[in-house]
């Protein structure tokens, strides 16, 4: 009879022989029952992830019947008082299996784990950035559109169709706008993760350049600590001067 450690090693394999599971089921040791229960929970979780991933790839699968290269686009940073809007365009291979989801539903650790896998396995990734000056000049919505067009232009493989999270991209390509696209499309979800990780890292860098605003934690959003820093230290070169609290500080 295998030891519990041996069973544990066998259950960690990619494929477990039915005979192993049958033997474990007949094993009267309490530890054996716990190992089997843990294995079954993992299998159920994996099956649920596969179903969810298939659901979130339904728009891609529809479009892949017509287009080989479908790019998902998303943005991060429309609401903050400081820093840029960052956009990403991602073309995923048809066999992509990583459990990407709306970046807001993932922890920072989960995003950082998925980020390199997206960069490695994607057919192409393009980044667009609209800094605070562009935002002040164009308005936040148009600046985001321009950054999205920039992200498409930076793809090393030309997309044939776009999936976009509730916006229109000013490029001459067929595009489908989805409400809550980052939760309903794996391509948009992947783009949201890439854009979020890049923007967060930028804001952490800015936190070192402009201490006193807590950029590393608030990412430029108008938190209590950020507003206190704005009152105490004034407006930095990365603040959006057209946004209310910043504009008010300039007038005071």
Swiss-Prot record:
Cited HAMAP family: RNase_HII_B (MF_00052_B)
What is the name of this protein?
Ribonuclease HII
Question: Any stretches that span the bilayer, and where are they?
Answer: none
Which co-factors does it depend on? Mn(2+); Mg(2+)
Q: What class of enzyme is it?
A: hydrolase
Question: What does the UniProt record say this protein does?
Answer: Endonuclease that specifically degrades the RNA of RNA-DNA hybrids.
Is Cytoplasm included in the keywords of this UniProt record? yes
Write down the EC number.
3.1.26.4
Note how many cofactor molecules are bound and how.
Answer: Manganese or magnesium. Binds 1 divalent metal ion per monomer in the absence of substrate. May bind a second metal ion after substrate binding.
* Recorded GO MF terms: manganese ion binding; RNA binding; RNA-DNA hybrid ribonuclease activity
Residues annotated as domain RNase H type-2? 68-252
Binding residues for a divalent metal cation: 74-75, 165
Q: Which Pfam families match?
A: RNase_HII (PF01351)
Family assignment?
Belongs to the RNase HII family.
Q: Where in the cell is it found?
A: Cytoplasm
This enzyme catalyses: Endonucleolytic cleavage to 5'-phosphomonoester
Primary residence: cytoplasm
Q: Which UniProt keywords apply?
A: Cytoplasm, Endonuclease, Hydrolase, Manganese, Metal-binding, Nuclease
Checking InterPro entries in the record gives: RNase_HII, RNase_HII/HIII, RNase_HII/HIII_dom, RNaseH-like_sf, RNaseH_sf
- GO-annotated cellular components: cytoplasm; ribonuclease H2 complex
- Set out the biological process GO terms recorded for this chain's protein: DNA replication, removal of RNA primer; mismatch repair
């Amino acid at each position: 009879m295998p030891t519990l450690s041996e069973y544990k090693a066998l259950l960690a394999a990619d494929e477990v022989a039915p005979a192993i599971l049958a033997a474990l089921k007949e094993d009267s040791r309490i530890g054996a029952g716990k190992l089997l229960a843990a294995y079954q929970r993992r299998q159920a979780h994996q099956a649920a992830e596969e179903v969810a991933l298939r659901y979130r790839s339904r728009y891609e699968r529809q479009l892949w019947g017509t287009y080989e290269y479908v790019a998902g686009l998303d943005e991060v940073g429309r609401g903050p008082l400081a820093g840029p809007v960052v956009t990403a365009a991602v073309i995923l291979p048809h066999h992509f299996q990583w459990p990407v989801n709306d970046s807001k539903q993932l922890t920072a650790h989960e995003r950082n784990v998925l980020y390199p896998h997206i960069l490695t396995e994607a057919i192409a990734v393009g980044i667009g950035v609209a800094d605070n000056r562009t935002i002040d000049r164009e308005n936040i919505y148009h600046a985001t559109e321009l950054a999205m067009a920039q992200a498409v232009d930076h793809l090393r493989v030309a997309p044939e169709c776009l999936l976009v999270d509730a916006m229109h991209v000013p490029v001459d390509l067929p595009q489908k706008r989805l409400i809550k696209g980052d939760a309903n499309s794996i391509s948009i979800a992947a783009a949201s993760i890439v854009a979020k990780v890049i923007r967060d890292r930028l804001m952490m860098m800015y936190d070192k350049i402009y201490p006193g605003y807590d950029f590393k934690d608030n990412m430029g959003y108008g938190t209590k600590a950020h507003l206190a820093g704005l009152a105490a230290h004034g407006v930095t070169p990365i603040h959006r001067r057209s946004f209310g609290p910043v504009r008010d500080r300039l007038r005071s």
